[in-house]
């Protein structure tokens, strides 16, 4: 059966890095139908909207979406609803993407590029699972008003609402436990249950779900301690599951442990396994068109696409092994280049991965 992939390169370095990931997917000779469409600023320029109906329709009808990056300074003056970044939010809503998976893997060859000492991060291989659709980012009511009470009653105040429904917590908890079950059977749930009612509710539900996974070791950690432990002893973790706000912060922190955000893929999944796959980095308009962007995060995102949405784990393993081989050969794009290694361009890195696949 042919499986359809929506290819959305986007802005900045997006087209350059997605091109290399597409080359890798095509080299596998799988029955894939790759259809490309505009998104973000590129879509606004062409259709006056960052997520045109045709692009959204393609994404909905596909088994998975391979996404590049969106955003450019030239769009900063647009009304918020027309800015490129709204495209990714719109896709998350329309596809019901609620689980964000962010691996943080330190390849041995890049240990010296990490922010931490090699002996602390050597062998790091963790995954952070972030809930995407709830929490303070989407809770209502929110806004600016005259404070109705408190010490500063009558002054202007900004306010947001942190909230989670039971079903939202249950489904992300299941993703966490299922992921842990396939790895080392350790799951750490991160919250702020000592202060927030929402977090205590989160913890209670996670504990209930844990009864269905007696083979998985569950632990809990307050988010402030988790942020510290990721720097102090990151290898104590295997799978972390947490809410939208905490996950947003912790996943970026974990990214810096690996040496370069240009190496980190991500997946966002819905209940049926349909997913959006993208590198964790942004559109980097300052280096767009120079041929120096690192395509490995996007290529690894394509591997996640094969693993989680197309049920092709063996092909995903092939891509990941090819990336490891290329790094072992000493090939580096500018962001991870250091003395004693060979600097290559975006397309040359793609060529090397293709050769390693053969």
From Swiss-Prot:
Comment on bound cofactor: Binds 1 Mg(2+) or Mn(2+) ion per subunit.
Pathway the protein takes part in: Amino-acid biosynthesis; L-leucine biosynthesis; L-leucine from 3-methyl-2-oxobutanoate: step 3/4
Annotated site (Important for catalysis): 137, 192
Protein residues bound to Mg(2+): 224, 248, 252
UniProt-listed Gene3D superfamilies: Isopropylmalate Dehydrogenase
Cofactor: Mg(2+); Mn(2+)
Enzyme Commission no: 1.1.1.85
UniProt subcellular location: Cytoplasm
Main subcellular location: cytoplasm
Keyword Electron transport listed: no
Subunit structure: Homodimer.
Name recorded for this polypeptide: 3-isopropylmalate dehydrogenase
Lineage of the organism: Bacteria, Pseudomonadati, Pseudomonadota, Betaproteobacteria, Burkholderiales
């Amino acid at each position: 059966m042919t499986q359809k992939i929506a290819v959305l390169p986007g802005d900045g370095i997006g087209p350059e890095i997605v091109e290399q990931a597409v080359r890798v997917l095509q080299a596998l000779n799988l029955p894939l139908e790759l259809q490309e469409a505009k998104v973000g600023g590129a879509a606004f320029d062409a259709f006056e909207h960052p997520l045109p109906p045709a692009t959204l329709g393609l994404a909905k009808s596909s088994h998975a979406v391979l996404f590049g990056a969106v955003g450019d300074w030239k769009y900063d003056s647009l009304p918020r609803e027309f800015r490129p970044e709204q495209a990714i939010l719109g896709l998350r809503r329309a596809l019901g993407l609620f689980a964000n998976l962010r691996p943080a893997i330190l390849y041995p060859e890049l240990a010296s590029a990490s922010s931490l000492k090699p002996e602390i991060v050597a062998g790091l291989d963790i995954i952070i699972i972030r809930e995407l659709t709830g929490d303070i980012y989407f809770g209502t009511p929110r806004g600016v008003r005259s404070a109705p009470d408190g010490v500063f009653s009558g002054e202007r105040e900004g306010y947001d609402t942190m909230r989670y429904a039971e079903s939202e917590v249950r489904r992300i908890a299941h993703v966490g436990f299922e992921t842990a079950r396939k790895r080392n059977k350790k799951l750490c749930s991160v919250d702020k249950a000592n202060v927030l009612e929402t977090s205590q509710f989160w913890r209670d539900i996670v504990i209930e779900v844990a009864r269905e996974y007696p083979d998985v070791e569950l632990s809990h950690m307050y988010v402030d301690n988790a942020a510290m432990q990721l720097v102090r002893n990151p290898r104590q973790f295997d799978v972390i599951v947490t809410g939208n706000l905490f996950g947003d912060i912790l996943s970026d922190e974990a990214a810096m442990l690996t040496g370069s955000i240009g190496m980190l893929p991500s997946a966002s999944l819905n209940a049926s396994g349909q997913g959006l796959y993208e590198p964790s980095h942004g559109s980097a308009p300052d280096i767009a068109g120079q041929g120096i962007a690192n395509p490995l995060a996007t290529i690894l995102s394509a591997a996640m696409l094969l693993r989680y949405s197309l049920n092709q784990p063996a092909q995903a393993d092939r891509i990941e092994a090819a990336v490891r081989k290329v790094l072992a050969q000493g090939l580096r794009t500018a962001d991870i280049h250091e003395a004693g290694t060979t600097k290559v361009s975006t397309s040359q890195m793609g060529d090397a991965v293709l050769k390693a696949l053969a």
